[in-house]
Amino acid sequence: MPLAKLCAKKLSSPLMKLCYPNLNGKLPFSNLSNILDNSSLKFHSCNPHITCRGLSTVALRPQTITKDDKRDFMAVFPDIVRDLTQLNPGISDLSTLISKIMQYNVSGGKKVRGLTVVYSYRMLAPDHALTPENIRLAQILGWCVEMLQGFFLVIDDLADQSITRRGRPCWYRNPDVGLRAGSDALLIQSGTFQLLQQHCKDREFYIDLVELFLDAVRRTTYGQTLDHVSSFPNITHLTMDRYNFITKYKTSYYTFHLPVATAMYMAGIYNTELHRQAKSVLLEMGHYFQVQDDYLDVFGDEEVIGKIGTDIQEGKCTWLAIVAFQRASPSQREILESCYGSKDPEKIKKVKDTFIEIGVPAVFHAYEEETYNLITRQIQQLSQGLPHELFLTLLHKTYGRKQ
């Protein structure tokens, strides 16, 4: 059943009319967070027909990716670097640079995207295909996804002039890097396709993978570009429709769809309907994930998330900003308009205080609970051939995250 219909069944008619007065019940799920106010919060907290996560009917608690999986995945990284550097024996300084770029920008982080490829393949492939050779290939493809992540982060940090990433200075802020970070990022991106060719060119799914990765790069670039040109003070850009587009392209495709679709092709799953169903769920997870990111950028613990939030001072088109402007009183709106997008620490604090005064954190937590349950129910509607446990695991690891 489409998630929009599930949403309509879960929410009362008064709340539907309040949140979507012009849609006549035909709501796009990604707009669930649009126009939530005190009435919706009150409904969420007291209506017995909304099932919170603790009352989920899911019988099987999703598994998690194990420490052994992480250890085995990391053990492949030196071989990845070796593959990328041994092709340049006559240019030793370039090989050294590529190794340094990879170590700094790819090997860190939680590696959730890469591990998702491996976990998804284990869940999707038939038993006879789970050979050491294929598991290793899944790990290599996982590193290809991690390399795209590193590529996007280097470019994004440079464009945003961010300060820290994963607990240390952004790559471009290193004294010997600077604007060269742009070409360094391209080395990471080109290395991704080098690995795909080196390890998969004789496989049946090679062309599908190349097209999948190229599509992820193109869509993510669209999203990043629109994100950079949608900053305040152009208040016409602070709309939920624009935000949904940015989120879908900037985050959802490469964070959730790419890893699972990679594993599906590797497991021999080419059925277009199964890919469509998986994509639908995964893009919704990506939207959910980005809303969480927006919240953590403002209210997260910098020591835990490993970076200093900059969305307020950059005037980003974020879920928090849109909800705040929609719910603000005239005086609160005046504060937001005069302070949002400023690098002045006092004005940044005023924006945070105003977010709290408006009740944005409470709206976010209501959104998070409702969305978790709605996506859970969409997962339960997936066809055979798409193991529910796989998608529930991804959702479970996303819910309530602090980094």
From Swiss-Prot:
Q: Name one GO cellular component term.
A: cytoplasm
InterPro entries listed in its UniProt record: FPS1-like, Isoprenoid_synthase_dom_sf, Polyprenyl_synt, Polyprenyl_synt_CS
Q: Where does Mg(2+) 2 bind?
A: 156, 160
Give the required cofactors: Mg(2+)
BP terms from Gene Ontology? farnesyl diphosphate biosynthetic process; isoprenoid biosynthetic process; pheromone biosynthetic process
Q: What is its EC number?
A: 2.5.1.68
Residues forming the motif DDXXD motif are 156-160
Q: What is known of its domains?
A: The Asp-Asp-Xaa-Xaa-Asp/Glu (DDXXD/E) motif is important for the catalytic activity, presumably through binding to Mg(2+).
Return the protein name: Farnesyl pyrophosphate synthase
Write the lineage as a comma-separated list: Eukaryota, Metazoa, Ecdysozoa, Arthropoda, Hexapoda
